[in-house]
Amino acid sequence: VTAASGNYNSTLTSEMGKSAAPTLFVVGNQAAVKTWDDYCIDLKDTDVYKELSTDAFNLKDENGKVASMGYCYESYGIIVNKKLLKKAGYEISDIKDFASLKSVAEDIHKRADKLGFDAFTSSGLDDASAWRFTGHLANMALFYEGRDDGWKEAPAEIKGTYLENFKNVWDLYINNSKYDKNTLATGGYDAEAEFKKGEAVFYQNGTWEYDKLKKSISDDDMQMIPIYCGVEGEEKAGLCSGTENCWAVNAKASKADQKATLEFMKWLVTSKEGTKVMAEQFGAIPYKKAADSGNVFLKNANDLLEAGNYNVDWAFNYTPNVDEWRASLVAAMNKYDAGGSWDDVKTAFVQGWATQYKAANK
């Protein structure tokens, strides 16, 4: 059964009430785990579970049962033009944490006129670009706080424990680019085009950019690295990877149907034909025998996970009234860029969350 866009939960509810209910279905977030937990078998001891290359994309219920397992994912981080980096006298291996990223970026910016390129692309805060920072960059502060505090659902309040780390990276972006930080609010910049033209070494974006960049920059000259922000132990960070594409198997189905479904899932992620289909349809899959999707950035994400680096989850999925929260954050960041106080950003981040949580949970 195929659900119309935005109607998956209602379609699933309807289908689960039928005599021939689906055996394989999607449980993509913690809210869905709460709703469908009774319908999910524990996948932990299944053969397909043993084929995972990481458990970073699995969802568990409050008792630790693996209710669903990720079958594909997307990632974002900092895309690096390795050719330009080398021209500036550096290698990727020189960047292992925020301190080294800062040192390299500031040196490139200092020599930008001589080199013919700068450190970072523009960080526009107009509607076309702001999500990269109010969503994806802000995620760094949300992820580490959520990791410390064990978030399983959206908290009513946040503390902003890692806001200084968010500031670290934002300052680095806006102070080491050829574009004046006072102009970022007005829009009109095209960071993707700047990167394609070789105007900057670093560009924060995701695996979805690969197809747009590959015609201008060769695979050998591109790599995605983690967003380092000055947190202890971050040299073992991976990319920011997430998904809402997670398989669950119906606990109310017959044992025979469950067995057939689990065998089919295993075939999809281990056989030559199955993994080829998965790579073509979904890109990166978190399984040991995954076929190469051809996307260099997805390979970078997988390599880091397989090396034992921790995944930086998409904690921004917890954001209450996401559009309103981000709009308030954009306004505060624009004020800060124009010489205002970081306290405004702190207020929008922390108090704004509490305000939007109340509004969303009346």
List the predicted regions and their residue ranges.
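Extracytoplasmic/periplasmic substrate-recognition and gating elements
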Residues: 88, 215-281
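Hinge/lid segment of periplasmic solute-binding proteins
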Residues: 28-80, 132, 138, 223-225
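A structural signal for short loop-to-beta-strand junctions that line the ligand-binding cleft
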Residues: 14-15, 22-23, 50-85, 116-118, ...
